[in-house]
């Protein structure tokens, strides 16, 4: 045992342990990939048995060192090639590794491994263990021959093999979990195994490929994959800072837009193909209609909208002024296609109450004072900063009535009905006395200045309009873009659209024509 006092013995032991770990990594990678085919509760067991058998096999082969040394003696020899027992084992192991790795790569590239865990068909436990043992035999032989070439003492070899296997056991679970969680790493590892299998075949046939080249290629690939994982980690970290609703909406809309972009290909399939199954598959691909995409987007983006973008603005509110005579009030109620009215004294900010048109008409016929009658139902007033999701609860409590939106100074900004919320989700439903906010013409859109930006953005299929929450209408956007109220005839460019001001007063923008620049499309 005095050789343990020799520093060169410890240096050789350390070097051999490192080499054994390096030579065992490919074995460890294959064990990790094979163990994924087993049920989760059997994977650790298979991994431990696989590495345990590798240790037993290597210790057994170490005890047969004198026989292993003779494995390099040719047993098949002719003028074209010569093969030893070692070469035959390496050749068999190389082809087996190439076959298994190719099958695994094919499965990954065809995406056949993504199945429901409840319905997934797992491989048999011992079938996986046998495959691990076969590869262990090949990798063990390579590791033992390396050990024999480096160290003369059998005890040192056994200690190095035991330590290397113990280190691999410690790292095996973490490596397995990492590989299984990162599918790009799995493909990278399978590519490494392809290279290793090819090198085993060429080595068996005496075509020498310097191991340094292989290690350099593997090291460079690992470096690139590290950069890839860092980039992905930073991307996920930046994405996590964004609102969850916004990320979910974008993901779902990307899916729907992807389906929408297939329509042209679907039509070609229907025209060119005479087969019933092709036509049937093309119909199944048309999953989402434009209206469905609009509504889903409206639901997903509702929470991120402001109350101002949902409400009917102050300028469009039809209200009853109690300072008018009864004949004027009666004519207003009969001519306006609304069933509910806010009743005010002189101006909209002086709200007395909310009445139904037919009930107020009956009260007027009975000579009942409009102010007295209207004060029975007081208005529900909400701030213009209220969250749209909380607004739904307020509308439920209103029991079919509307709610008044007011700013911090008590000035009425607009009103919201359940129909306004529905329009925010499904699009515009014009009243009998209204014209549509958006009229689509040949290659342009004629849009009212008060049109909600969210609805317009969905219709134009763009994300370039809403950059801030300071404005909710098209007019507000164009005024903010120009820095002042634009005049009729002016053109404002917001990529990829041109906004032609058709009609504007000194206070607001009334009508805009939108034209998309086809060169920017």
UniProtKB/Swiss-Prot annotation:
Transmembrane portions of the chain: 13-33, 49-69, 80-100, 125-145, 150-170, 185-205, 207-227
Membrane topology field: Multi-pass membrane protein
Name of one Pfam family that matches: CorC_HlyC
UniProt-annotated location(s): Cell membrane
Superkingdom of this protein's organism: Bacteria
Record-linked InterPro entries: CBS_dom, CBS_dom_sf, FAD-bd_PCMH-like_sf, FAD-bd_PCMH_sub2, Integral_membrane_TerC, Ion_transp-like_CBS, Transptr-assoc_dom
UniProt feature coiled coil, ranges: none
Keywords in alphabetical order: CBS domain, Cell membrane, Membrane, Repeat, Transmembrane, Transmembrane helix
Gene3D superfamilies, alphabetized: 3.30.465.10, CBS-domain
GO cellular component, one term: plasma membrane
GO function term, MF aspect, one: flavin adenine dinucleotide binding
Presence of the UniProt keyword Nucleotidyltransferase in the record: no
Domain CBS: 311-370, 374-434
Homology family: Belongs to the UPF0053 family.
PANTHER family hit by this protein: HEMOLYSIN-RELATED, UPF0053 INNER MEMBRANE PROTEIN YOAE
Name assigned to this protein: UPF0053 protein BU323
């Amino acid at each position: 045992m005095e050789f343990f006092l020799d520093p060169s013995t410890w240096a050789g032991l350390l070097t051999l342990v490192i080499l054994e770990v390096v030579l065992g990594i490919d074995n460890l990678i294959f064990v990790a990939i094979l163990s994924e085919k087993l049920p989760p509760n059997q994977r650790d067991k298979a991994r431990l048995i696989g590495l345990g058998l590798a240790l037993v096999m290597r210790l057994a082969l170490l005890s047969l060192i004198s026989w292993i040394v003779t494995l390099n003696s040719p047993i098949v020899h002719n003028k074209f090639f010569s093969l030893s027992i070692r070469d035959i084992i390496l050749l068999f192991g190389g082809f087996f590794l190439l076959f298994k790795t190719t099958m695994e790569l094919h499965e990954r590239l065809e995406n056949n491994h993504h199945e429901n865990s409840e319905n997934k068909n797992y491989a048999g436990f011992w079938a996986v263990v046998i495959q691990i043992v076969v590869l262990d035999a090949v990798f063990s032989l390579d590791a033992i021959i390396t050990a024999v070439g480096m160290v003369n003492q059998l005890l040192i070899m056994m200690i190095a093999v035991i330590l290397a296997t113990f280190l691999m056991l410690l790292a095996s679970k973490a490596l397995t979990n990492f590989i299984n969680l990162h599918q790009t790493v799995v493909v990278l590892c399978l590519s490494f195994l392809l290279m290793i299998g090819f090198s085993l075949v060429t080595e068996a046939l005496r075509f020498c490929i310097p191991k340094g080249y292989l290690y350099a290629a593997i090291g460079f690939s690992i470096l690139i994959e590290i950069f890839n994982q860092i980039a992905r980690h930073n991307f996920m970290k930046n994405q996590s800072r964004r609102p969850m609703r916004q990320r979910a909406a974008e993901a779902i809309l990307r899916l729907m837009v992807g389906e929408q972009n297939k329509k042209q290909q679907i039509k070609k399939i229907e025209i060119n193909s005479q087969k019933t199954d092709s036509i049937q598959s093309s119909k199944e691909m048309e999953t989402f209609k434009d209206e469905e995409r609009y509504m889903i987007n409206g639901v997903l983006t509702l929470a991120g909208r402001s109350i101002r973008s949902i409400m009917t603005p102050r300028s469009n509110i039809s209200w009853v002024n109690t300072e008018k005579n009864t004949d004027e009030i009666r004519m207003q109620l009969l001519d306006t296609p609304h069933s509910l009215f806010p009743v005010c004294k002189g101006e909209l900010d002086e709200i007395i109450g909310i009445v139904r048109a037919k009930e107020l008409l009956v009260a007027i016929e009975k000579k009942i004072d409009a102010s007295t009658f209207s004060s029975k139902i007081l208005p529900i007033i909400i701030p213009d900063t209220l969250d749209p999701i909380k607004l739904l609860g307020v509308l439920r409590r209103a029991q079919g009535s509307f709610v008044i939106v007011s700013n911090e100074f008590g000035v009425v900004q607009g009103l919201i009905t359940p129909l306004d919320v529905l329009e925010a989700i499904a699009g515009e439903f014009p009243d009998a006395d209204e014209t549509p906010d958006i009229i689509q013409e040949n290659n342009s859109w004629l849009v009212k200045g008060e049109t909600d930006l969210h609805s317009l953005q969905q219709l134009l299929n763009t994300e370039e309009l809403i950059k801030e929450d300071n404005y909710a209408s098209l007019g507000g956007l164009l005024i903010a873009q120009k820095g002042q109220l634009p005049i009729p005839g002016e053109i404002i460019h917001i990529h990829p659209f041109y906004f032609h001001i058709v009609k504007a007063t000194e206070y607001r923008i009334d009508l805009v024509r939108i034209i998309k620049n086809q060169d920017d499309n």
